[in-house]
Amino acid sequence: LANPPWNQDGYGEDTLKRAEFWQKRFEYGFPTNQSADWAWIQHMLASSKEKVAVVIDTGAVSRGGKEKLIRQKILEKDLIESVILLPEKLFYNTGAPAVVIVFNKQKPENKKGKILLINASKEYQEGKKQNLLTKENIQKIVKAYREFKDIEKFSKVITIEEAKQADYNLSPSRFVSIIEEEKYRPL
């Protein structure tokens, strides 16, 4: 599990091509100079044999441009196993929510061609300055991850084709609505 710097700037193609072994390390493409999120992710993928889990800014799963093209190539290789949306205000340095992207180079047969999206944005205990994940919150997330199935208002298994139809946007909130339907009283 890694938590690299989010949206780190200054790591576009020109900078990354100066690195040793850049052809193997950045085989899915180069990110923009504005965000090195997918440079960090590709570095980890190039260094791993099986699974990688990355805590990263939510924009990493939804931004367009070069980042979308990198996501597309990684999806076409069927390397993304799960995207878990975490609550906001979990980290000291930002109030923004995060996602955990789980990559698996050796997906079991029952997970091939599929991605599990978990919307855990409401799974927290409120704190004064920060929210926290309780033991129960963590257990619920882990159980959903292990079961790899649809759970109403919490998780959804999508196909790579569905991700393609969503323009490679893997934001769990796009596929798993947690908003309660409002009930109106007649006037």
Where are these regions (language model features)?
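A conserved structural/catalytic subdomain of Rossmann-like adenosyl-cofactor enzymes
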Residues: 1-187
